[in-house]
């Protein structure tokens, strides 16, 4: 069990490095878009509540 947890932690640390990596210089113009992209699914989640409120939570 402990070995599985250690593997999980090792993978989590490696993924953090990938997420925080910078884009290559050629794609630097897309930095603002890439910064907003992880938030887009949250907007869809909130849109579901707005939609339900507009139809009175049927």
Swiss-Prot record:
Pfam families: PsbK (PF02533). It is a single-pass membrane protein. Its main location: plastid. It is found in: Plastid, Chloroplast thylakoid membrane. Belongs to the PsbK family. One of the components of the core complex of photosystem II (PSII). PSII is a light-driven water:plastoquinone oxidoreductase that uses light energy to abstract electrons from H(2)O, generating O(2) and a proton gradient subsequently used for ATP formation. It consists of a core antenna complex that captures photons, and an electron transfer chain that converts photonic excitation into a charge separation. HAMAP family: PSII_PsbK. PSII is composed of 1 copy each of membrane proteins PsbA, PsbB, PsbC, PsbD, PsbE, PsbF, PsbH, PsbI, PsbJ, PsbK, PsbL, PsbM, PsbT, PsbX, PsbY, PsbZ, Psb30/Ycf12, at least 3 peripheral proteins of the oxygen-evolving complex and a large number of cofactors. It forms dimeric complexes. This is Photosystem II reaction center protein K. It comes from Physcomitrium patens (Spreading-leaved earth moss). The gene is psbK.
């Amino acid at each position: 069990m402990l070995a599985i947890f250690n593997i999980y932690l090792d993978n989590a640390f490696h993924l953090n490095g990938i997420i925080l990596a910078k884009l290559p210089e050629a794609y630097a113009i897309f930095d603002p878009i890439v910064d907003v992209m992880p938030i887009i699914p949250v907007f869809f989640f909130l849109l579901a509540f707005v939609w339900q409120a507009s139809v009175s939570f049927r």
